[in-house]
């Protein structure tokens, strides 16, 4: 049986029908933005209503998200939204205004990919972000949206003296430790991408939409 495992506890399947779509806000970077196009077809196939919104800056870290909250007069985010498969007009915005514009059921957060494997980069900024979301939207369920490791030939891996598997191992541990501090569930898109890579006869680069299509499978899984 198919279920919205990543959103477990938010609402029942019956409550997710199209007349009452699940409202999801993603505060992230380029590793989350394509979910706006990848997830609606999946939700449609399951006859589930989905209102999904992404606010992102490429390469945006938890620290930068927090610093942007501290400068609310700026609108540095590209905001895209899709309501039951219908795309809304994109606009520039900031976290305070978008977070309070709707009664979001779910808010996802993630670390920048280049910092994701370094656990010391998550706090205090991630904790500040969590506290702010809870204060502004106490009814929302916060989920940690995992990113994935780089391709084996990415120069940054050699600069860091680690390989793809080591980056994946460390980012999983860092995300897990961060989520456990607050009792959050993780959307394990990075793990899904890594498992997919291992099944391929060639090395796989999870670029743009490709990686997110693979990752979106982890929003919905079999019981």
Predicted stretch roles:
Residues 19-21, 49, 104, 139-140:
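A general structural motif
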Residues 31, 57-59, 149, 193:
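Residue-level detector of flexible, active-site-proximal loop/helix-junction positions
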Residues 13-45:
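N-terminal module-boundary/linker segments of secreted carbohydrate-active enzymes
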Residues 7-13:
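Sec/Tat signal peptide C-region and signal peptidase I cleavage site
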Residues 1-6:
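Bacterial N-terminal signal peptides
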Residues 33-126:
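Conserved SGNH/GDSL esterase-like catalytic core that processes O-acyl groups on lipids
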Residues 91-223:
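Alpha-helical cap/lid subdomain in secreted, periplasmic
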């Amino acid at each position: 049986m198919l279920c919205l495992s990543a959103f477990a506890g938010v609402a029942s399947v019956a409550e997710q029908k199209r007349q009452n779509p699940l409202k999801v806000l993603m505060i992230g970077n380029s590793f989350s933005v394509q979910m706006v196009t990848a997830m609606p077809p999946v939700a449609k196939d399951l006859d589930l209503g989905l209102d999904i919104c992404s606010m992102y800056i490429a390469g945006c870290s938890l620290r930068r998200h927090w610093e942007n909250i501290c400068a609310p007069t700026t609108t540095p985010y590209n905001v895209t939204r899709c309501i039951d498969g219908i795309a809304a007009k994109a606009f520039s915005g900031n976290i305070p205004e978008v977070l309070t514009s709707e009664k979001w059921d779910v808010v996802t957060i993630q670390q920048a990919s280049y910092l994701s494997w370094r656990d010391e980069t998550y706090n205090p900024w991630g904790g500040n972000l969590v506290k702010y979301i809870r204060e502004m939207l106490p009814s929302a369920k916060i989920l940690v949206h995992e990113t994935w490791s780089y391709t084996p030939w990415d120069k940054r891996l050699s600069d860091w003296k680690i390989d793809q598997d080591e980056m994946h191992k460390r980012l999983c541990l860092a995300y897990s430790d961060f989520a456990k501090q607050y009792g959050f569930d993780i959307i394990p898109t990075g793990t899904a991408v890594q498992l997919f890579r291992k099944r391929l006869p060639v090395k796989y680069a999870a670029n743009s939409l490709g990686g997110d299509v693979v990752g979106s499978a982890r929003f919905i899984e079999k019981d």
